[in-house]
Amino acid sequence: MLISNEWLKDYVNVDQSVQALAERITRTGIEVDDIIDYTKDIKKLVVGHVLSKTPHPNADKLNICQVDLGEEEPVQIVCGAPNVDEGQHVIVAKVGGRLPGGIKIKRAKLRGERSEGMICSLQEIGISSHVTPKNYESGIYVFPEAVKPGTDALEAIYLNDQVMEFDLTPNRADALSMVGTAYEVAALYQTKMNKPQLTSNESQESAKDELTIEVKNEDKVPYYSTRVVHDVTIGPSPVWMQFRLIKAGIRPINNVVDISNYVLLEYGQPLHMFDQEQIGSQSIEVRQAKKDETMRTLDGEERRLLDTDIVITNGKDPIALGGVMGGDFSEVTEQTRHVVVEGAIFDPVSIRHTSRRLNLRSESSSRFEKGIATEFVDEAVDRACYLLERYASGTVLKDRVSHGDLGSFVTPIEITADKVNRTIGFNLTDEEIIDIFEQLGFDTENKNGEITVNVPSRRKDISIKEDLIEEVARIYGYDEIPSTLPVFKDVTSGELTDRQFKTRTVKETLEGAGLDQAITYSLVSKNHATDFALQNRPTIELLMPMSEAHSTLRQSLLPHLIDAVSYNVARKNTNVKLYEIGRVFFGNGEGELPDEVEYLSGILTGDFVNNTWQGKKESVDFYLTKGVVERIAEKLNLQFDFRAGQIDGLHPGRTAIVSLNGKDIGFIGELHPTLAANNDLKRTYVFELNYDAMMEVSVGYINYEPIPRFPGVTRDIALEVNHEVTSSELLSIIHENGEDILNDTLVFDVYEGEHLEKGKKSIAIRLSYLDTENTLTDERVNAVHDKILEALKKHGAIIR
C-alpha cells in the first residue's frame, strides 16, 4: 500500500517529518518498506506558459516555442513533443535544473536554434509510464487549467510529496486504506482524525423508483447496496485527484472511474460504477453463475464461468463478475449520463477462487479476499456520490437501494487493566488504557474496572483479549516496556529434559545409520490427509487455506517425505534416506480441540551402501529398514514386536505392524508398487512410529550388567515348518520355554528349495544359554533345550 503524506494530511495532521512518521509506524508493527520522494533529484522545475509555437526551419518534428516562465522575458525552447501548442501551461525544467536519472539542463543549440530549457513529459520527471494518463503517454503534460507561470511545478501537480510504501501482513487489511492508516496515525500521536465529507444535495427523485435489487445467494453476498446518480458529465478528474491516484499506482481514466478508484483507496471498500442506461433493465439480480455461462469483462476477454462464481445480472445476463471485474457492455464511457454506484460484501473465499482461476487479481479482489469493513460499505458509496456531485456535476437521487444486512459494526471484548499490566509489564490506569482504545476509534465502557472494548469491523485482526493487549503495547510503545529480570521460585541449572535426551539419542542413532533429518509441512491436500493413518479419525481442515495442496492438517508424516524423496530422485539423487520427528493431528468432532501426537517416520530408497573400492554394494530392503527400527528400540530400551499386516499404500506382502506392550504403534513396509511408480520411485521402504507412545514406555537408559563370570553355551537348531509360519512365532515359543537360562536367540538362516517339500521352509536358530550365578551343566542345558524342542514339535515344527 502506497500512502501519500500530502493525502494523509486530509485526515490527520502530524507535525513530524515523513521519516520520523515512518519510523514510528514501523515500531508499532506495520513495516514501512520504502519512502518515495518525488522531489529527489529534481531542481528548477516550474510552470511555463507557451506564448507561441513556430516550426523549426531545419527539422520537421521540432518546434520553436516562446515560453513565459514568470520572469522579465520569455525564453526560447525547442520542443519535439507532438502535442505542444500555443496557449498551453506546461512543466518546464529551467537551465541549471536537474531531472531524475542525473539529467542536467543546459543551454544548447538544436539544429542551429537556441534552446534554454526543456518542456517535460510526466515520465521525464519520474512518473512511471504505466500510471501516466493515456492522453499524455507520448507527449508533454499539459495543465487542464491556467497556472501562474513560474509556480513550482511539483506543487502545481501535488508531487511536492513523499510516499510511504507499507509492507503489510495479511491480518492488517485495515491499513490498505487512507482512512484506516489515519486511525493508526491519530492514535500514535494522540490527535484528532478527520473523516471525509459524505453528505450530498439529494434530489427529490428516489432511486427506489428506478431500481430494484434481488440477491439469490445471501450466503455469498450478505449485503448489496446501490445509489443512483443522474446527469453526470464525463471528463478528466481534478488534477489533485489524478496525481493522488498516480502516487498510489493507479492510472487516471476519467472523473467517474477515478472517483471509484479514489474511494477504494480512501476507504478500502471496492466500488463499481454501472452505466444505468446500459444495464438493460431496472432490476439487478445477484446470483451464482451457471456452469459454462459466459460474459465479456472490462478487459475485453470472454470468460467462461463456473457455478462457484458470483455474478451481477440484469435479471438475465451477467453485467459484472462480483468483486472481481465489471462487464464491458455496462461500463462507464464518454456517453454515460446516469450511473449506478455499487457497494457490497462478497464472500472472501469465492472471490479468491474466482480471481485466481481467471488470473484477474486487482486492487478490489485483493481487498475482498482479506475481508472488508462492514462499517465502511455505505459510507464509501455515499462518499462516491458526494464526489460525483462535486466533480462530475451529477445529481444524487435520494434513498439507498439495498438487500441484506450489514450486521453489527463492532465486536465487544472485555478486558481489565490488571490483565494488561500483568501481561506486558506496564503500570497503566483504566483511563490511560481507555484513552488508547478511543484514539484508535474503539468505543469503550468501564464498569467497575471491567472495560468493554467495542472493536470496529475494520480491525479483523482483533478477536480476543490478547489482541487488545497487543494494541495497548503497540500504541503505548514497545520501547516503553520496562526492563525486568526474570524471577524464578526454583532456580535450577540448565540441562536436557528426559525427553530431549531420548530424542537426541534417537536422532544420533538414525543419523549414524545414514538417514538425514527432514522437516516438512504440517499441511497436506485433503486427498492425502489420511494416507498411511493407523487410526480412523476425522481430519482438521483450514477454513481459508492458501491453496488446495495445503488445506488439511496431516495424519501421517509420510506423504510429504515421499514427495521429498521423489523430488530428489527426479534430480538424479537416487540414494535417499530421510527421517522426521513431527506432529500429526486427529480430530475429535465438532467444537472439540484435536489431538496432537508426535510421530517418528523414515523413508529409504536406492543403495544403503554405495559401490566401494571393494566392489561391495548393498541396496535398501525390508530387513535393513527393520534393523534401523530395532536399533532405535534398543537405544530406548524398548522391546518391539512385529507381525505381518496390511496398510493402504504399502506392499501387501512386505508390511509389518509394530507393537509395543501389546499396543500397535506403527508399521514398516515397502511402498506399494503403484504408489512408487506414480512418484517415479524404485523399491522404497518406510516406517512410521507413534513417538509419544515410545516416550511413555521408554526408561531412557540401559541397566549395567557386569561381564559374566561363567561361560555360556550355544546350541543351533534347524526347524522345518510350513511356509506361512514366521520366525517371530518360533522365537516366541522358544522364549516362553527357555526358563531363566535362555539368554539370547538369533535367526541365522532361512532356506527354501531342494530337499524340502513344497510349501515348507527351514529356519536355523542359535540359542545362547547363560547362568550369571553358576556354571551351567550339560544336564541343566539339555533339560531346558529338550523342553524347547518338545514345545516346538507340538506347534508343528520338525527338528532337522
Swiss-Prot record:
This is Phenylalanine--tRNA ligase beta subunit. It comes from Staphylococcus epidermidis (strain ATCC 12228 / FDA PCI 1200). GO terms for biological process: phenylalanyl-tRNA aminoacylation. It is an enzyme of class 6 (ligase). GO terms for cellular component: phenylalanine-tRNA ligase complex. Its EC number is 6.1.1.20. Residues 39-154 form the tRNA-binding domain. Its main location: cytoplasm. Signal peptide: none annotated. Transmembrane segments: none annotated.
